[in-house]
Curated annotation (Swiss-Prot):
It catalyses: L-arginyl-[protein] + S-adenosyl-L-methionine = N(omega)-methyl-L-arginyl-[protein] + S-adenosyl-L-homocysteine + H(+); L-arginyl-[protein] + 2 S-adenosyl-L-methionine = N(omega),N(omega)-dimethyl-L-arginyl-[protein] + 2 S-adenosyl-L-homocysteine + 2 H(+). It comes from Arabidopsis thaliana. The gene is PRMT3. Residues 1-50 are annotated as: Disordered. The keyword S-adenosyl-L-methionine applies. Disulfide bonds: none annotated. Protein-arginine N-methyltransferase that catalyzes both the monomethylation and asymmetric dimethylation of the guanidino nitrogens of arginine residues in target proteins, and therefore falls into the group of type I methyltransferases. Its main location: cytoplasm. It is found in: Cytoplasm, Cytosol. This is Probable protein arginine N-methyltransferase 3.
Length: 601
């Protein structure tokens, strides 16, 4: 195999070019003025929709009326051939989408006006834009993102670009920290090398740049104009979301619901009480203790010290009172083993004395809807890396996501088709349109699944890195063989299992499952509805079928559905974004792609 060599070169703008750019400028200056055009020319009145044809250069503040003109300008003025790069690197739509956002972010941070890439071999190379965060528009009004592939006929993935952009814009703001802008430099000949894992390193800051204020962040807001604001505002917004999040757990109703969830509570109880070798005499940390039920189990199991961490002030007081009532609380007046710390785990040092890497067992019920909603896993991983001993136990220690296709019975359509003898299906159709953008959390009956379940993603909580919380995975759905007939797949359902495996729970490993095949839990399942149902049938039904109709129709059912699913933490703190791509495969190997859908939970 040819040796891989990548040259990733930054070219600074010349002194002549520098004169053309104001040192006082910022990302907001890169937007067109109120008239939307350059050179002070007056704009003719129109229907107010010119923003869709206003394309901003990737490297400077020039505006163009078409992508072709923009990319030609980038090639001639900045040495960047976008179409050539796509062809050379074989970038699909999503990789190209990420590349544009990556360049925007680097230019905003580094003010580099030219960029060159050369390579002998790109096989197995991971480029710096190959991260899920670059699926979020860096600039919310970026028309280029849904227009750059308009003229390409061989694009493998088909989609409604306008609809995709509308959905992507719902992902919200994106903040860029420019505190270090201009602090580091590199020469024009500096090259990015490939390390042992074949990762291409990120762009370094260019030299000769004006230092920006350390308190400034560039924030793309919901308004038409980007704003430059104090960086502390972002932290305040995060704190506000955290306060609302932890405050929501101050209601006793949600705790009753969780405690009444026997599948959930008994799985944790069995893991803590039926593994004496693990718990007896150990130091235990419970992240997000709520009422303290898991900490009480740990104390009962013989732990020598239990640190219960709770960020909700009210619930920290409740957990303290419960621990005292059950005679396990530990302070100057009580001789128990359980301590309650009112704190976020990231700030635990301020609330309690505990040495780093001194915890034997880290336990937490961190899972949210679709496993990752609420983004609490990041806090658990922080606690693992900060407090857990090397080789210490984390409970649960595995998490696995599954996916399957569901039929019409899992939707509300049948209800609205016959309401006391009246046809109200128009309501059902309107609800259906909403569910193609918003996930539904509900219990799916096993009988309503029309495909076999399949594995989507696995997490090893003992070893995973925090950035692996965001992921992209593929799966193939096969129609169920139990009913040898054609059925409509209206969407996919996601669920998860968490495992207390024999790695740590040697005496009594157990599994907490939220599957449609097991008793329901308060997590239910997460439902993602297709924009249009896909007809599927098992191979036995399709044998000899040589129809020419579109794949996935009732006349030509798909033999399987290939999925590409991405889950990433959203801009809105503690929310997640889910992108879903579906491809129907015929028994003859033909394919049909459906538009990508983006959901926010």
């Amino acid at each position: 195999m040819a040796a891989t060599m990548v040259k990733h070169e930054i070219l600074n703008y010349s002194e002549d070019e520098e004169e053309n750019y104001s040192d006082e400028g910022d990302w907001g200056d890169w937007k067109a003025d109120d008239n939307g055009i350059e050179g002070g020319e007056e704009e003719e009145e129109d229907d107010g929709d010119d923003s869709e044809s206003d394309f901003l250069c990737l490297f400077c503040d020039s505006h163009f009326v078409s992508c072709d003109l923009l990319f030609e300008h980038c090639r001639l003025s900045h040495g960047f051939d976008f179409h050539g790069v796509r062809k050379e690197l074989k970038l699909d739509f999503y990789s190209s989408f990420k590349l544009i956002n990556y360049i925007r972010s680097q230019v905003a941070e580094n003010m580099c006006f030219s960029w060159k890439i050369e390579a002998d071999d790109y096989k197995d190379v991971k480029f710096p834009w190959d991260e899920e965060k670059y699926l979020k528009p860096f600039w919310q009004e970026d028309s280029l993102l849904y227009s750059f592939a308009d003229d390409e006929e061989d694009e493998e993935v088909t989609f409604d670009r306008e609809e995709v952009m509308e959905e992507l814009q719902k992902l919200g703001d994106l903040s860029i920290d420019v505190e270090a802008l201009g602090e580091s430099s590199m020469s024009n000949s500096d090259k990015c090398n490939i390390n042992g894992s074949k990762d291409v390193t990120s762009l370094s800051n260019c030299n000769g740049l004006k230092q920006s204020s350390a308190d400034d962040l560039i924030v793309n807001g919901k308004d038409a104009e980007p704003k430059v604001c104090d960086g502390r505002l972002v932290n305040r917004n995060i704190r506000k979301v955290n306060e609302n999040y932890f405050g929501s757990y101050s209601s006793f109703g949600i705790h009753r619901e969780m405690l009444s969830d026997k599948v959930r509570t008994e799985a944790y109880r069995d893991a803590l009480l039926k593994n004496p070798t693990l718990l007896n005499g150990s130091v235990v940390m419970d992240v997000g203790c709520g009422t303290g039920i898991l900490s009480l189990f740990a104390a009962k199991a013989g732990a020598s010290r239990v640190v219960a961490v709770e960020a909700s002030e009210k619930m920290a007081k409740v957990a303290t009172k419960i621990a005292k009532d059950n005679k396990v609380f530990n302070d100057n007046e009580h001789n128990g083993v359980l301590e309650v710390a009112h704190s976020m785990v990231e700030e635990l040092d301020k609330s309690i004395q505990i040495q780093p890497h001194s915890v034997d067992v880290l336990v937490s019920e961190w899972m949210g809807y679709c496993l990752l909603y609420e983004s609490m896993l990041s806090s658990v991983l922080y606690a693992r890396d900060r407090w857990l001993k090397p080789g210490g136990a984390i409970l649960p220690d595995t998490a696995t996501m599954f996916v399957a296709g569901f039929g019409k019975g899992a939707t509300s359509l049948p209800f609205w088709e016959d309401v006391y003898g009246f046809d109200m299906s128009s309501i059902g159709k309107e609800i259906h349109d909403d569910t193609t953008r918003l996930p539904i959390v509900d219990v799916i009956a096993e009988r309503d699944l029309v495909t076999q379940p399949t594995l989507l993603q696995t997490f090893d909580l003992a070893t995973m890195k925090p950035d692996e919380v965001d992921f992209t995975a593929t799966a193939t759905l096969e129609p169920t063989e139990s009913e040898a007939k054609t059925r409509l797949c209206h969407g996919v359902v996601l669920w998860f299992d968490t495992g207390f495996t024999s790695r740590f729970c040697k005496e009594n490993p157990t599994v907490l499952s939220t599957s449609p095949y097991t008793p329901p839990t308060h997590w239910a399942q997460t439902i993602l509805t297709f924009q249009e149902p896909i007809s599927v049938a098992p191979a036995s039904v399709l044998s000899g079928n040589d129809r020419r109709e579109a794949i996935g129709t009732e006349e030509c059912p798909a033999s399987s559905i290939h999925l590409r699913v991405s889950v990433a933490r959203a801009h809105e703190h503690r929310s997640i974004d889910i992108s879903l791509e579906a491809t129907g495969l015929s028994s003859k190997g033909q394919k049909r792609h459906w538009p990508v859908q983006i959901f926010n939970l």
